[in-house]
Curated annotation (Swiss-Prot):
ATP binds at G336, P337, N338, T339, G340, G341, K342, T343. The gene is mutS2. It is an enzyme of class 3 (hydrolase). Signal peptide: none annotated. Endonuclease that is involved in the suppression of homologous recombination and thus may have a key role in the control of bacterial genetic diversity. This is Endonuclease MutS2. It comes from Staphylococcus aureus (strain bovine RF122 / ET3-1). CDD domains: ABC_MutS2. Residues 707-782 form the Smr domain.
Length: 782
């Protein structure tokens, strides 16, 4: 992509803002290298990278990259035999520490966001090498400033000797400076250091009272810094030990440098990956600052930017506009007043495309769509000055000639005030001819103009659309709103009237313009009104769609919660049943044990095999913990609406209300209506019955699966319940619903106590929320 285009569209300012978000020189280097890609797959991948990291950044607290720095130069120096110092080793240690923290963060992220995939970050984490040994070797050998005393046995011994010798020197010198006889002879009662030797400050006139070596004197010459002869040999010993210490430190650092050289390839990979992460996190931070969104890239030529705004303008005051090249539109011509925002619209389009192809989220609403352009060409300059000289026209024409040489069908071309700076009639003619040529090349074009001739340009050419920037006549100022499909119109008469020009003058002026031009202005005015009306309706439609989507999401979540609740209740019921069977089984075992003892003691004739067989039947009643039952579906006729079926997964009867498609049907089970897989349904065969039983069967079919006792007195309710249960048993119902309402709870308690004693009821439970909750009791019949 041309550097001139990047400069005109101020891409460097965007890069500078992203650079401000980096932590390390690694990330900064990658920002400085950031350029728009032109390969489709590369552009898509870069956007996926940024979007994934942005999603993580917006939801989680990322590990700190503080202290991360470029270390490749140190690694290369280690590889060729150089020796790294403690500071350089610490930067390498920090690199390893940061990458390990990111590994830990990613592992926690995978656990927290179970089921969510992060392929980009996963790939980068898999690239990171294992450098634990090198980290420990550096960490155990030195701190931020120096090697530890225990970095080696030799170093520890040397430093121990230095410490003890220093202590002896101090003790010796302390005796001298604290001596009462020496107080008046010393400038200060302290021990100091000159030329790495321990000395005392002696007044010049008492020099002869102290044997030793003079190492320095004060600026006035009144103080001499003397190393007393009593500590000269000890100071010499310190110097020898310091030399030994330096040699040992060099040996240790050489050893550590060798470890670094051995892991050079792994370290370079770690540096590369962590630099990429710093770069991507900086992109994510910047994207959040502009509320950026991810565009959808398409192979076919597409530009759709809903509510786009220029990212360098104040987000609070800038007017966002939808910029769109509708189907089959290749050229958009924007007309309207100067300073109305036409140039900003051009720059917004160009800059957003460059940002998107550089892997940056863009300042639009969700749903933007773009194709990938091989190049963006623009001719945008100082056309908004009042006077435009010939040199200005020549400069722009030179730029346009250069654009026409290189533009092709994969290019986006932006012309600002095309043809301006010369005679209006010639400028308009040139503008139309240039647009025709670019359209022939196949480039996508957006151009601004104030020539009225170009308003009619789209009328006799396919693929051309007019647009305009709105002007508020009441405030005499532009609104900066872009009206796609509506050409700009002259507001001279309205503005003049607003400013107080005589109506006679205005009316006379109107008679001087042609009828065609008057009709065009009226048509444009009508288009503006229609555009605003349609735009208002579109915004309302968007709002309703979003509300509908939200309601759908909420209902889906509630349905899922209901299903989970239903499953938990069924599992709980089965668990209770299993516990009862387990208790009965244990009791049977105890009885069998007692009978065996009785038979052995008294020789009683006990048929143990019959007892064991009956005990085994208890095991057959154990409920599987899973809701789904392992029932082999029998093959009957095709299931249609109205069929009675058995729902295999729940073991319940139901009626098919509707066949949704080849795979699903809506089934009524009692008062529950559910969408179920057809393969989970077994059509119940109609029994062949004798004619004498026909009346009985018809009566059964009239019995509902629910009994409403609300409004009944207590005694009447129980009588009605008894009659209903008898009829339900005759109708072969497996489960019925007793509606007693909530009220004081007396009727509910009475119904449930009655059910507990009833011979035909095997179990009962309270209703689920979808079944009526506490106002319903569900009874299972034997």
């Amino acid at each position: 992509m041309r550097q001139k285009t990047l400069d005109v569209l101020e891409f460097e300012k965007i890069k500078s803002l992203v650079a401000n978000e980096t932590i390390s020189d690694l990330g900064l280097e990658k920002v400085n290298q950031m350029m728009p890609a032109t390969n489709f797959e590369t552009v898509v991948f870069q956007m996926e990278e940024t979007d994934e990291i942005a999603q993580i950044y917006n939801k989680h607290r990322l590990p700190s990259l503080s202290g991360l720095s470029k270390v490749s130069a140190f690694i290369h120096r280690a590889d060729i035999g150089g020796v790294l110092n403690v500071s350089e080793l610490n930067l390498i240690k920090r690199l390893i520490q940061v990458q390990n923290q990111f590994k830990t963060f990613y592992n926690q992220l995978v656990e927290e966001d179970e089921g969510v995939k992060y392929p980009i970050l996963d790939d980068k984490m898999n690239q990171l090498p294992v450098l634990t040994d090198l980290f420990q070797q550096i960490n155990e050998t030195c701190d931020t400033y120096d090697l530890y005393d225990n970095a080696s046995y030799e170093l520890q011994g040397i430093r121990s000797k230095i410490s003890s010798t220093n202590q002896r020197i101090r003790q010796n010198l302390d005796r001298i400076v604290k001596s009462q006889a020496n107080q008046k002879k010393l400038s200060d009662a302290i021990v100091t250091v000159r030329n790495e030797r321990n000395v005392i400050p002696v007044k010049a006139e008492y020099r002869q009272d102290f044997n030793g070596i003079v190492h320095d004197q004060s600026a006035s010459g009144q103080t001499l810094y003397i190393e007393p002869s009593s500590v000269v040999e000890m100071n010499n010993q310190i110097s020898r030990l310091r030399h030994d210490e330096a040699i040992e430190k060099e040996r240790i650092l050489t050893q550590l440098t060798g470890y670094v050289a051995a892991d050079k390839d792994a370290l370079l990979v770690a540096e590369h990956v962590m630099g990429q992460l710093d770069f991507l996190i900086a992109k994510a931070r910047y994207s959040r600052s502009i509320k950026g969104t991810k565009p959808i890239f398409k192979e076919e030529r597409t530009v759709y930017l809903p509510k786009a705004y220029h990212p360098l303008l104040n987000r609070e005051t800038v007017v966002a506009n939808t910029i769109e090249f509708m189907e089959d539109i290749e050229t958009v011509i924007i007309t309207g007043p100067n300073t109305g925002g036409k140039t900003v619209t051009l720059k917004t389009l160009g800059l957003i495309i460059i940002m998107a192809q550089s892997g940056l989220l863009i300042p639009t609403l969700d749903g933007s769509q773009l194709s990938v352009f091989k190049n963006v060409y623009c001719d945008i300059g100082d056309e908004q000055s009042i006077e435009q000289s010939l040199s200005t026209f020549s400069s722009h024409m030179t730029n346009i000639v250069e654009i026409l040489k290189h533009a092709d069908k994969h290019s986006l071309v932006l012309f600002d005030e095309l043809g301006a700076g010369t005679d209006p009639s010639e400028g308009a003619a040139l503008a139309m001819s240039i647009l025709d040529h670019v359209r022939k090349i196949g480039s996508l074009v957006m151009a601004t103009t104030h020539y009225p001739e170009l308003k009619a340009y789209s009328c006799n050419r396919e693929g051309v659309m007019n647009a305009s920037v709105e002007f508020d006549v009441d405030t005499l100022s532009p609104t900066y709103k872009l009206l796609m499909g509506v050409p700009g119109r002259s507001n001279a008469f309205d503005i003049s009237k607003k400013l107080g020009l005589s109506l006679n003058i205005i009316n006379k002026a109107k008679t001087m313009i042609g009828t065609d031009e008057k009709e065009i202005n009226e048509m444009i005015e009508s288009l503006e009104r229609n555009y605003k009306r349609v735009e208002t309706q579109r915004l309302e439609l968007d709002r309703l769609v979003k509300e509908a989507e939200q309601v759908h999401d909420d209902l889906s979540k509630q349905y899922q919660q209901f299903q989970n609740y239903e499953k938990s209740l069924i599992e709980e019921a089965k668990e209770k049943a299993n516990q009862k069977i387990k208790a009965a089984t244990k009791e049977a075992d105890d009885i069998i044990k007692d009978l065996r003892q009785l038979r052995e003691q008294k020789g009683a004739d006990v048929k143990e095999h019959e007892l064991i067989d009956k005990k085994k039947r208890l095991d057959d009643h154990y409920e599987a913990k899973s809701i789904k039952q392992n029932v082999q579906k029998q093959k009957y006729d095709k299931i249609v609406a109205g069929d009675e079926v058995k729902v295999l997964s729940y073991g319940q009867k139901g009626e098919v209300l509707e066949i949704v498609n080849d795979e699903e049907a809506i089934v009524q089970m009692g008062i529950i209506k559910m969408k179920l897989p057809i393969e989970d349904l077994e059509k119940k065969q109609k029994e062949k019955v004798k004619p004498t039983k026909m009346v009985t069967r018809q009566n059964r079919q009239t019995i509902k699966t629910e009994l409403d006792l609300r409004g009944y007195r207590y005694e009447d309710a129980l009588i009605e319940l008894d009659q209903y249960l008898d009829q339900a048993v005759l109708s072969n119902y497996e489960q019925v619903y007793i509606i007693h309402g909530k009220g004081t709870g007396a009727l509910q308690k009475g119904v449930q106590q009655h059910l507990k004693k009833h011979k035909s009821v095997s179990d009962f439970r309270g209703g689920m929320p979808s079944e009526g909750g506490f106002g319903v009791t569900v009874a299972t019949l034997k």
